[in-house]
Amino acid sequence: MKKRIGIVGAGTAGLHLGLFLRQHDVDVTVYTDRKPDEYSGLRLLNTVAHHAVTVQREVALDVNEWPSEEFGYFGHYYYVGGSQPMRFYGDLKAPSRAVDYRLYQPMLMRALEARGGKSCYDDVSTEDLEGLSEQYDLLVVCTGKNALGKVFEKQSENSPFEKPQRALCVGLFKGIKEAPIRAVTMSFSPGHGELIEIPTLSFNGMSTALVLENHIGSDLEVLAHTKYDDDPRAFLDLMLEKLRKHHPSVAERIDPAEFDLANSSLDILQGGVVPAFRDGHATLSNGKTIIGLGDVQATVDPVLGQGANMASHAAWILGEEILAHSVYDLRFSEHLERRRQDRVLCATRWTNFILSALSALPPEFLAFLQILSQSREMADEFTDNFNYPERQWDRFSSPERIGQWCNQYAPTIAA
């Protein structure tokens, strides 16, 4: 008998899982409250970059609509402010790519439906889960909407924060000239905030995502509270002023006459994220085990761009485990966690560490930045390992590991 899988949520996790399962003729139904043709009128959903490991999965799923060789980027520029600013660059071994999710998500939804996946357009609440679980061999929850996240118990040891660590201002902009190499820029203004600049394909072609991770109480926090719609010119002037002061390596490429939101006033998000890590399964009152996937298991701040990439990874692993098993109980969830947890948990821990380190600036982290800025080999490793958060956590998980890493690359610094 053909397996039947129910998926609640049509984000990257749910849709990558659905597409994987349809490749293996598994019956899939996705529950979502949005139809594909509704996305174009939505506010910006996020500013997500897909690293090469995720692009490879998209190739395998035959949904690589925008090849990274044409639309992607090839490395990271870094800027560290202070009395002696540091500028340096690191290469990616294979390009990453960012596409406006208002284009990307409906493409995935249409691909899934074209391949025989079913879609049910409706809200799903916690009260619906038990009934849905009876209809499928396995129910997978991929969204925290409507309190669905509370079904999965939060792990306090992996959820150190009770409130947002940054006041976010995120938008898609035009009027920013590309750097000599199409690349992300990661700019750090000590004590004030971080900026991640991401070349991003949107409705009108290539644009620039600016992810401003403003420290709460800093000179930059005002950007998270000033509304574009109240006075667009005043907002843009404030943004330019703050970028020139805190993130000059980006500001110097802006044409003030052209600088604006890329498409419309819907191209901006402001607010904050409370990072959390939850159990990857829950047992309902009817005895059925359900699986949590993507953001509902691991919610991370966007500073390192790990959310969608670890969600896609976990979806692929879950798909393989669904194929390998026929009973989806607590023991199944243990098999799943054994395979997916290292990357998902390391992405969470690494992101949380960086949030804290960029605020507190402990001496071992400052030493890391100094060596990183002078060793191209170290910068290349650090940059490419955005694909592999478990490798990053191997480097950052203790002061001793950071010190050993710095000692490894110190001899590579040019005299």
UniProtKB/Swiss-Prot annotation:
Keywords: FAD, Flavoprotein, Monooxygenase, Oxidoreductase
EC category name: oxidoreductase
Taxonomy, superkingdom: Bacteria
One example GO MF annotation: oxidoreductase activity, acting on paired donors, with incorporation or reduction of molecular oxygen, reduced flavin or flavoprotein as one donor, and incorporation of one atom of oxygen
NCBIfam families documented for this protein: StyMonoxStyA
Subunit structure: Homodimer. A direct interaction with the monooxygenase reductase component StyB seems not to be necessary for the enzymatic activity.
Family classification: Belongs to the StyA family.
Protein name: Styrene monooxygenase StyA
Organism: Pseudomonas fluorescens
Gene: styA
